[in-house]
């Protein structure tokens, strides 16, 4: 009898853990409304949207502040595993190309906003060429309105490469490869 109770208890624990893990890893995606471009619309050559977001000090920041630079807008979240994989590459690209007029702009889509991002930035260090480094590029807080202006998101990470003249030249949904990222950035510098 004890054996049956132990087996049933173990199965119940596994079921509860599976349900919890599934809910914790789901991406909450809002379908764009109205006349917003759909997520699969090709953005190539379209002007980057005029957007305002909050920086980590609570001040307004705009995409227009980066005009004249090549900008990789990266929508991410602290709980997103593929985002975590690509962050070291973004740190490296920021180091490598910043002097040539490039920057990464990380847009956190965490529902908890600053409350989730601040502890993550304070704690996390990423392996970049054998060094443990913090995120070295600007991070702002995004929301559904910002995502809609970019045409909506199907998940995270989603990145947009914006040329010096403010046009979207590349969109990548999901994890971008290191080689693809390097090639795309270098094509704009």
Please provide the spans of the model-predicted regions.
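Thiol-/selenol-based redox modules, centered on thioredoxin-like
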Residues: 34, 155-189
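N-terminal targeting signals for export/organelle localization
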Residues: 1-50, 171
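Residue-level recognition of beta-strand->loop/alpha-helix junctions
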Residues: 108-110, 141, 172
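Conserved redox-active cysteine motifs that mediate thiol-disulfide chemistry
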Residues: 67, 75-92
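A short beta-strand-turn-helix
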Residues: 45, 50-71, 94-97, 150
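Short, internal strand/loop/helix patches
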Residues: 118-164
């Amino acid at each position: 009898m004890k054996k049956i109770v132990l087996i049933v208890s173990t199965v119940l624990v596994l079921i509860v853990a599976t349900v919890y893990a599934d809910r914790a890893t789901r991406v909450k995606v809002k379908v764009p409304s109205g006349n917003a471009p759909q997520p699969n619309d090709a953005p190539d050559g379209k002007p980057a949207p005029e957007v305002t977001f909050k920086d980590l000090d609570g001040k307004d920041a705009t995409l227009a502040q980066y005009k004249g630079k090549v900008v990789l807008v990266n929508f991410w979240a602290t709980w997103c595993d593929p985002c975590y994989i690509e962050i070291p590459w973004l740190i490296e690209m920021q180091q490598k190309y910043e002097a040539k007029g490039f920057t990464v702009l990380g847009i956190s889509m965490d529902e908890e906003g600053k409350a989730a991002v601040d502890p993550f930035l304070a704690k996390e260090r990423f392996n970049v060429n054998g060094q443990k480094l913090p995120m070295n590029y600007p991070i702002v807080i995004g929301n559904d309105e910002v995502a809609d202006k970019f045409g909506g998101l199907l998940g995270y990470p989603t990145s947009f490469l914006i040329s010096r003249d403010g046009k979207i030249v590349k969109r990548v949904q999901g994890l971008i490869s290191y080689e693809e990222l390097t090639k795309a950035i270098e094509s704009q510098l």
